[in-house]
Amino acid sequence: DVEIFAVGVKDAVRSELEAIATPPTATHVYTVEDFDAFQRISFELTQSIWLRIEQELKSIKVKSLTPPRDLSFAEVTSSSFRVSWSPAAEDAIAYLVNYTVALGGEEFVVSVPAPTTSTVLTNLFPKTTYEVRVVAEYPEGESPPLKGEETTLEVRGAPRNLRVTDETTDSFKVGWTPAPGNVLRYRIAYRPVAGGERKEVTVQGNERATTLYNLFPDTKYHVSGVPEYQSGPGTALNGNGATEEVVGEPKNLRVSEPTTSTAMRLTWDKAPGKVQRYLRNLHSRSAGGDIKEVTVKGDTSTTVLKELDPGTAYTLSVNPLYASGAGTAVTGEGATLQERGSPRDLIIKDITDTTIGTSWTAAPGMVRGYRIAWQSLFDDKTGENHVPGDTTNTVLRNLDPETKYRLSVYANYASGEGDPLSGEATTEASPDGKIVKISEETETTMKATWQPAPGNVLNYRVVYRPRAGGRQIVAKVPPAVTSTVLRRLTPLTTYDISVIPVYKEGDGKTRQGSGTTLSPFNAPRSIKTSEPTRSTFRVTWEPAPGEVKGYKITFHPEGDDGYLGEMMVGPYDSTVVLEELRARTSYKVNVFGVFDDGQSPPLIGHETTTLRDAPRSPIPSSGLDCTTKAQADIVLLVDGSWSIGRPNFKIVRNFISRVVEVFDIGSDRVQIAVSQYSGDPRTEWQLNTHKTKKSLMDAVANLPYKGGNTNTGSALKFILENNFRPGVGMREKARKIAILLTDGKSQDDIVAPSKRYADEGIELYAVGIKNADENELKEIASDPDELYMYNVADFSLLTNIVNDLTENVCNSVKGPGGLNPPSNLVTSEPTPRSFRVTWVPPSQSVERFKVEYYPVAGGRPQEVYVRGTQTTTVLVGLKPETEYYVNVYSVEGNEISEPLAGTETTLPIPSVRNMNLYDIGTTTMRVKW
């Protein structure tokens, strides 16, 4: 082999030099900057070359020395083994044995003088591989090594100190001190010493004990424990153990075949284990009783106790006897029989539909209790009660109604039951079973229905007759049928009906009921009560079919017929408010249809008044002040019928106050009269009664509630003839206005009176509330309906129309002779923030103009005023791109005209145009647009 040193000069690549040179590169590769730098590395390079020459010479010399041969190992244990070899050359001085753990660790050296060629290496680790090198020593040096490997054995041994504890009849626990070394498992073998099957179990090597189960009782066992290693089994540890004898108690001690005199049989289930004998004890429970003991063979499980006292209770015990001693005794009780008897004098009482009460005279002797058995004679149902021996009565419950039962009372003694005391009884019919239900009533028929009677019914006998007296009618109904139609009855007549089930033995329990045939007059329908207050509530119904002439309403507190209220309303009324009721009281209401020849059956409803009235918010003031020099005569016609009620009439008064408060009241301004109507109209005050607003408002606040039917047509005619006439304040040149407030449909004609209002130039407003007929309101009101007709669903909603109504009535007061509005509205010159408004003034001169404007989308109105000679103005401060409402009014003093209306939209903000950049520098520029 050639050993190469590489020297690189200047630009030589070191990686190429390292690839060329012999390893290691640290002593075989050198680099210099140029040829002049050789002096720097010459000493180091020369020294490396000489060192390698010396090493090679020594290696050549060693190779010439003869090494030992044939390395072998023997006598391997867990901590030692023997190393042997064949001798080297005759001039070998000694042998050096070097050994170390093969995976790395401290190296040990043993010197063996020649000519010895074997040695034992000791104190080794168990189950460990060692690397061994043997070198022959010569005067000239050491030979090359002879190498080999050997592995020590694992540690193996025997467990110690075998222990047997926790012995039972079929198990004991085996424990031991662990065996040395790495035990994989322990194999525990055991068999009876007297001979038998050998069994074994294994446990983990880290366990120190195990329990052997399913052993024979009272048996000695030979036990052996062997540790198992990876390399094989260790040494066994032997010992003995024994199970305990089975000791227990007999089970299920039973007494049978007792007699009235001297004997009873005692039987038990055998005790476990090898019982030698049973010890039987017998002890009378009476004071001073003797204890009798007798033993029987261990294979016996029954015996007869003799020479006993009659009617006597005994305490009994059976105790098993084993070789090791007594087991546990089983105990019980038994008694000889007594003489038995029967109760007497059975009494049956307090019978209901599901119960029967019974009592009897006590049976003789020591009765422990009574069993009362019952059986239905109609079917297979049975049952029984139990009572203590000192009780002589009971109630049989959960029986079937209307059923015949056989009852038997048995006296229960310690020795059994005596003969029964028997009797029979029949339960009553159930509450529903006693009733005949009536349905499908007509004027001449009704249907009778009843619950089926139990048992074998032959038929039902149906008997009915008028309660007021008359001929009795009898019908027969088959047993499978439980209803029938009674025919040929008199209208509006109450009948008493009886249904009797008929049996072979006789009649059963009677079922009774009553029913009334219908009136030939139909009742109203669908009654509804609502709006309860402390003293009122509303009753509403659907009209009765036919030529009804009116409705009668009666009402009284539930359960108190003595306080009966009654009222009548017309045929077109279908609602009424009942008044002057008790607070927090349930009322029953009857609504009858009244016809020419009689009245219908009642339509019945119920309602409860409240403890206190709910607070009502007053209708707010409209805030309008109707300022005008015009004269007007206004007549309010107010519906005061029963359908309104006092609580709602308070709202009506408040509504009237909000309407009339806007006017300037006086003989030269506005005059207001009020008439109230129901069945017959009446004037509350005339046009000229109140000269001031205060006087008028006081009168409205105290307007009384009239009550009655809704006759709107006659009321309209009434105010034409009684309120719109000169003698009571009507002025010829004043504008004439009528306002009707009603909550129902008129029961008389309204077409002709309404036409008279139009003919006489009277403006007529119609305000309908709740139950008002909208078509009727349109017929009454002046045209157009949008201006003169109002209809709200409830009195509380009057607040929603008070402003519109007041404003429209104010305009009617002003009339067409007021200020004329400007005309010909033109908008122009729109910008993003403004536009111009221009108009043509009215024919008459005005003091000034008011221009009102606000966004169409919503917002607070703004206004500007200009002189009466000016007909244009610019509205500024507006929002860009926004549509505005514009109203222009003529203004003269406190009078203001109707508006001249229009719209205009502002322009959007324009974008920048013609932008130029100039004077551009490094950090600045100018912008022009």
UniProtKB/Swiss-Prot annotation:
GO terms for cellular component: collagen trimer; extracellular region. Trimer of identical chains each containing 190 kDa of non-triple-helical sequences. It comes from Notophthalmus viridescens. InterPro entries: ECM_Regulatory_Proteins, FN3_dom, FN3_sf, Ig-like_fold, VWF_A, vWFA_dom_sf. Keywords: Cell adhesion, Collagen, Disulfide bond, Extracellular matrix, Glycoprotein, Proteoglycan, Repeat, Secreted. Its main location: secreted. Belongs to the fibril-associated collagens with interrupted helices (FACIT) family. Residues 67-156, 158-250, 251-340, 342-432, 434-521, 523-613, 821-910 form the Fibronectin type-III domain. The triple-helical tail is stabilized by disulfide bonds at each end. Residues 1-49, 633-805 form the VWFA domain. It is found in: Secreted, Extracellular space, Extracellular matrix. This is Collagen alpha-1(XII) chain. Glycans are attached at residues 98, 231, 324, 415. One of its GO terms (biological process) is cell adhesion. It comes from the Eukaryota. Type XII collagen interacts with type I collagen-containing fibrils, the COL1 domain could be associated with the surface of the fibrils, and the COL2 and NC3 domains may be localized in the perifibrillar matrix. Could play a developmental role in regeneration.
